Regions:
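Glycine-rich beta->alpha junctions and the first turn(s) of the following alpha-helix
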Residues: 3-12, 52, 80, 186-281
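Residue-level signal for inorganic ion chemistry
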Residues: 9, 20, 74, 103, ...
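C-terminal helix-coil-helix/basic helical segment that borders enzyme active sites and/or dimer interfaces
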Residues: 27-38, 250, 254, 258-261, ...
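Internal helix-loop-helix
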Residues: 48-108, 112, 116-117, 154-161, ...
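Structural signature of FAD isoalloxazine-binding scaffolds in flavoprotein oxidoreductases
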Residues: 65-74, 111, 132-136, 179, ...
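A short, Trp-centered hydrophobic/proline-enriched beta-strand micro-motif
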Residues: 117-128
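A short core secondary-structure module
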Residues: 124, 149-186
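A structural signal for short hydrophobic beta-strand segments in well-ordered beta-sheet cores
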Residues: 139-141
Length: 303
């Protein structure tokens, strides 16, 4: 396998890296952790101004019309900066679902607003603490209304619309719907999770208006398709975060002295850093393969 990013994609990576270096230090993430804010509006607005929220949205709907590989390089830099923004929920999941499975009218209605950051979207799948499966989806859709409960929903408190996974009572198939979270009969409760860096919410739908999306006969396969694509992008975020952690550990090992020597000069510390480096590079290789499958539509993506 001979895979690498193009020069244009590397330039995009550098542009995003510079913006985040200048505007998203770790102090920004700490501020979100220690406050009632759900995300950094300043960093989000900067990403919007760069056009990144419309990276993979077709140009006809106001996006940049780029692809999965461009999103991969953006994701790596977001992870490196631990950027406290709803990018994964809104771009990797919500927007991607509409691009793939929205009707023409739904694309015309929602994508331009998502491209310019006027709206934030999320993906509402789980209903319990267990792994979501086709069998445990209890939220129902019937006659343009949905009823049920989703928990936890990442970035559920700050999102404007949600792609909600439901069971269509007309045919008993799993389907996707679009719900305006600001409308009546939608209740949201912010919840605490093991990850305080992300906003999570419980969302309750009580005869809420919903738009049925066009998943054809795919059913649960459509959900797997969206999640598999997002998993590759999240892997790139994790690579960026892991590499940043390694660099921080290396800098500390060179700056910290014990018994008159840099602790980085001790073999045990060198081994720890070397092990971290090897694991990161292995993860990078796997992620690059995932990016290639994502770009080419290969069958190995689901693996």
């Amino acid at each position: 396998m001979n895979f690498d990013f193009s020069e244009d994609q590397k330039m995009l990576k550098e542009q995003v890296s510079k913006f985040l270096s200048d505007n998203c230090s770790l102090d920004v993430a700490r501020d979100i952790l220690e406050s009632d804010k759900t995300y950094s509006e300043e960093v989000w607005r900067g990403l919007v101004d760069l056009g990144l929220t419309g990276t993979a949205i077709p140009e006809e709907y106001g996006g940049l019309g780029l692809g999965a590989l461009e999103l991969c390089v953006v994701a790596e830099e977001l992870g490196r900066a631990a950027a406290p923004v709803p990018f994964s929920s809104s771009v990797y999941l919500g927007t991607e679902a509409i691009v793939k499975y929205g009707t023409d009218s739904q694309k015309e209605k929602w994508l331009p607003k998502l491209a310019v950051g006027e709206l934030i979207s999320t993906f509402a799948l789980p209903e319990t603490n267990s792994e979501p499966t086709e069998k445990n989806i209890k939220t129902t859709f019937s006659n343009g209304k949905i009823n049920g409960r989703k928990i936890p929903v990442a970035d559920g408190s700050c999102s404007d619309i949600a792609i909600v996974v439901v069971k269509n009572t007309d045919n008993d198939h799993i389907a996707l719907t679009i719900v305006d979270l600001t409308s009546e009969n939608v209740k949201r409760n912010q919840i605490s999770t093991l990850d305080p860096s992300r906003d999570h919410a419980e969302i309750i739908f009580e005869n809420s208006d919903a738009e049925l999306m066009d998943t054809g006969d795919e059913g649960w396969g459509a959900i797997e398709n969206i999640l598999n694509s997002a998993a590759v992008l999240m892997a790139f975020e994790q690579i960026g975060g892991a590499e940043a952690s390694l660099n921080m550990a290396k800098d500390y090992a060179l700056d910290r002295y014990a018994f008159g020597r840099q602790i980085g000069s001790y073999q045990a510390i060198k081994h720890k850093l070397a092990d971290m480096y090897v694991k990161i590079e292995l993860a990078r290789s796997n992620s690059y393969y995932g990016a290639m499958m994502l770009n080419d539509g290969g069958d190995d993506l689901k693996i």
